[in-house]
From Swiss-Prot:
Organism: Mus musculus
Example of a GO MF term: K48-linked polyubiquitin modification-dependent protein binding
Name the UniProt record assigns to this protein: Inhibitor of nuclear factor kappa-B kinase subunit epsilon
Induction summary: Induced by lipopolysaccharide (LPS) and TNFA. Under high-fat diet, highly induced (via NF-kappa-B) in adipocytes and M1-polarized adipose tissue macrophages.
The record's account of how the chain is modified after translation: Sumoylation by TOPORS upon DNA damage is required for protection of cells against DNA damage-induced cell death. Desumoylated by SENP1.
Gene that specifies this protein: Ikbke
Binding partners and assembly: Homodimer. Interacts with MAVS/IPS1. Interacts (via protein kinase domain) with TTLL12 (via N-terminus); the interaction prevents MAVS binding to IKBKE. Interacts with the adapter proteins AZI2/NAP1, TANK and TBKBP1/SINTBAD. Interacts with SIKE1. Interacts with TICAM1/TRIF, IRF3 and RIGI; interactions are disrupted by the interaction between IKBKE and SIKE1. Interacts with TOPORS; induced by DNA damage. Interacts with CYLD, IKBKB, IKBKG and MYD88. Interacts with IFIH1. Interacts with DDX3X; the interaction may be induced upon virus infection. Interacts with TRIM6 (via SPRY box).
Annotated crosslink Glycyl lysine isopeptide (Lys-Gly) (interchain with G-Cter in SUMO1) location: K231
GO biological-process terms attached to the record: cellular response to virus; gene expression; immune response; interleukin-17-mediated signaling pathway; intrinsic apoptotic signaling pathway in response to DNA damage; mRNA stabilization; positive regulation of canonical NF-kappaB signal transduction; positive regulation of lipid storage
Entries under Gene3D superfamilies matching the protein: 1.20.1270.420, Phosphatidylinositol 3-kinase Catalytic Subunit, Chain A, domain 1, Phosphorylase Kinase, domain 1, Transferase(Phosphotransferase) domain 1
Amino acid sequence: MQSTTNYLWHTDDLLGQGATASVYKARNKKSGEVVAVKVFNSASYRRPPEVQVREFEVLRRLNHQNIVKLFAVEETGGSRQKVLIMEYCSSGSLLSVLEDPENTFGLSEEEFLVVLRCVVAGMNHLRENGIVHRDIKPGNIMRLVGEEGQSIYKLSDFGAARKLDDDEKFVSVYGTEEYLHPDMYERAVLRKPQQKAFGVTVDLWSIGVTLYHAATGSLPFIPFGGPRRNKEIMYRITTEKPAGAISGTQKQENGPLEWSYSLPITCRLSMGLQNQLVPILANILEVEEDKCWGFDQFFAETSDILQRTVIHVFSLPQAVLHHVYIHAHNTIAIFLEAVYEQTNVTPKHQEYLFEGHPCVLEPSLSAQHIAHTAASSPLTLFSMSSDTPKGLAFRDPALDVPKFVPKVDLQADYSTAKGVLGAGYQALWLARVLLDGQALMLRGLHWVLEVLQDTCQQTLEVTRTALLYLSSSLGTERFSSGAGMPDVQERKEATELRTRLQTLSEILSKCSHNVTETQRSLSCLGEELLKNRDQIHEDNKSIQKIQCCLDKMHFIYKQFKKSRMRPGLSYNEEQIHKLDKVNFSHLAKRLLQVFQEECVQTYQVSLVTHGKRMRQVQRAQNHLHLIGHSVATCNSEARGAQESLNKIFDQLLLDRASEQGAEVSPQPMAPHPGPDPKDLVFHMQELCNDMKLLAFDLQDNNRLIERLHRVPSAPDV
C-alpha cells in the first residue's frame, strides 16, 4: 500500500503506465471516494524542473467537463514524490472501447458523435486557455458513463502539454508515433535532424488520426507490416498523401501505396454523416502547414455538424435508409435538395409518408416543421422511379476472418480470436440492419397501398355519383322523347347531346370497373405483405442464432485474453486450449453460415420481390392517374353538355311563355293530341333545375378528382 495525507492505494490497482508515471486507482481516506492518482517515476525527475511542474500548472488552469479534473497535488509519505489526485474515469479510455471486438470496424454513429462532441469541446477549452496538448490519441481520452447511461469522454494526460499561443512555436518532441504529425514523426521516430519548429496545429493531425480510428476501428496510414515495423514507409505515406486523401495503405512488401478518399465500406457511419466528416479529415490530415486548416475553421466545421439535426428517410425505390443532416433553421427546400443528393430523386418527384399518413412538405417552411424521426420510424420516401432497388451495400464479414496458426501460440491465438470475434459482431450488426431494412420495405409498401386504396375508394365514389346523375338525366321522359321541341335543329342538337352523355356514361362505367380491378389487385398485394411481415418475426431467430454463437465465442476469447500474458501452459491446459480453438472455429463457421444462408439470402430475395412489387404499385398508380384524368375529362365534357342543354331548355321555356301570352289563331286539327302547355312548362322547369344541379355536382366532382389525382407520372429515364 502507498498513501498521501488524504489518499491511499494498492500498487496492484494499476490503471495505466507511461514513460514517466504510473496511474493507480485510489480512495479518499475519509469519504472512500474513488480517484485516480498519478505517481511519477525516477525518469520523470530527470526532466528539467520547469517541465516537471508543467503538468500541475496546466491542469490548474483547466476546468471543463470534457477534461479530467485535478483535485489536488500531494506527496507520498516516505519518498515525498509528487502525486496528482485526479478524477477517476471508471469506463476505461476510447482506446479500450475501440479494442473491444464489438467495435473492430468502428463506433456506432451515435457513439461517434458523442466522441466528436466531447473531443471538440475539450480541445476548444484548451485553445481558449492557450494550451497545446501534443499527445492526443484514443488512450488519452478517458470515458465514464453518466447517470442516464450516456458516455462522457474527457481529455487526459497533460504530461506533454504546455502553454502556447497561436503564433508561437515549440521545438521539443512529444507524442505517440501513430498519431504524430509527420514533421514531428521525422524527428522523433526517424531521428532525422531538422530545425523545424511546431505550432498548435500539430494537435489537429492527431485529432484527425484519432477520429478516423474511432470511425473505422483502424489507423488511416498503415505500411506493410504495420506502423511500428516499417517506419520509413509510414513516413512516406503521411508525407506523400495526395490532397483530399484521408488514408493510405501498403498491402504488399515494397508494393505501391494505395490512397482512399472515403471511409471504408465496413464503416458503420451513415453516408449522410460521412459526407460531412470526410472533408474535415481531408483538411486536418494535411502535412503542408499552409494548406492545413487552422483551429478556427476546424471548430467551425465540426460545430456545424454537431448543431445539425438528423432526419431519417427510408427510400422505398432504393430500399435504403438515409440520414439527412440539416440545420433546424434550414428551409424544407434545402432538406429536399439534401435528399436528392443522397437518393437522386428530384424534389418535384419526392412524396413522403410518415407513420402511414401522407406528409406534405411545404418547401418554404423551416425544417423544424418536419416530424421527429428515428431509424425505426423514418420518413418514407415514395417516388415513381423505375430503378431496381439496390439495398444496403456491405462487405461480407467472412472476407475479414483471420485463421489460427496450427501450433499453440498464446499471443497469436488471442489476436486471431479477437479478429474472428470482430467479424462475428460485424455480421450480427449487419444481420440486424438487413432485417430492419426488410421491415421498412414491407411497412412502407403497406402504407403506400393504403393510400392508393383510399384513392381508389374516393375515385369510385366520385365516378359512381357522376354515373347516377347521368343515368337520372338520360332517363328523363321529356328529354328522351324530345317532346315539346318542334324545331328540327333543336331536336337534333338535343339528340347529339344525349348521345354524347350516353358515351360519357359508358366511359365512366368502364373507369369504375377498372378502378375496382385495381382495388382488387392492390388488396391481393396487401395480403402478401401481411404474410411477409409475419415472416419477419421468424427471421429474427437467425439473429438469435448468431448471438448465441457470439456468446460462446466471447467466453473462449476471454480465456485466450487471460492466457496470453502467461509464459506457457501445462500439458492439460494446452489440450484444453487446442479444443477451445477448434470449438471457436466451428462456432465462427456456423455463425457465418447462418448469416450468409439465412440473413443475406433472405434479404436478397426480399429485394427482388420488393422490386417487383414496386413496379406493380407503379403500374397501379399510373393507371389510377390515367383513370383520374379520364374521369376529370368526362366530368368537364358532361358539364359542357349540360350547359348546352340548359340553354336549349331555357330558350324553350321562353318560347312557351311568349306563346301563352299572345293571341293565337286557331290551329288546325293535329293527327295526334299534343301535350298540355302548362304540363310541359312544369316539366321543362323541373328538368332544367335537375340539369343545373347536375352541373354543379359535376363541377364539385371535377375539383375532387383533381385533388385525388395530382399524382405525377413516372419521370423520364
